[in-house]
Amino acid sequence: MSRVCQVTGKGPVTGNNISHANNKTRRRFLPNLQHHRFWVEEEKRFVRLRVSAKGMRIIDKRGISVVLAELRRDGKV
């Protein structure tokens, strides 16, 4: 399973670890992904999504029904 948020599309980005001696080695910054079950009142069932913390805030703000409708329209769910 890829490390991509289903709501925001956020994925890993690359950067550097930098030591005290200013040595640089490559690293990945991973999004804060969580598996979360959301209750959809219109469908009377749970929907399980892999979302970032930012994605959960978007769902809290706009509502799960609106977000799900957009994901289904775009073919992401």
UniProtKB/Swiss-Prot annotation:
GO terms for biological process: translation. It comes from the Bacteria. InterPro entries: Ribosomal_bL28 (IPR026569), Ribosomal_bL28/bL31-like_sf (IPR034704), Ribosomal_bL28_bact-type (IPR001383), Ribosomal_bL28_sf (IPR037147). Keywords: Ribonucleoprotein, Ribosomal protein. GO terms for cellular component: cytosolic large ribosomal subunit. The keyword RNA-binding does not apply. The keyword Protein transport does not apply. Transmembrane segments: none annotated. Residues 1-20 are annotated as: Disordered. It holds the Pfam family Ribosomal_L28. One of its GO terms (molecular function) is structural constituent of ribosome. Gene3D superfamilies: Ribosomal protein L28/L24. Belongs to the bacterial ribosomal protein bL28 family. This is Large ribosomal subunit protein bL28.
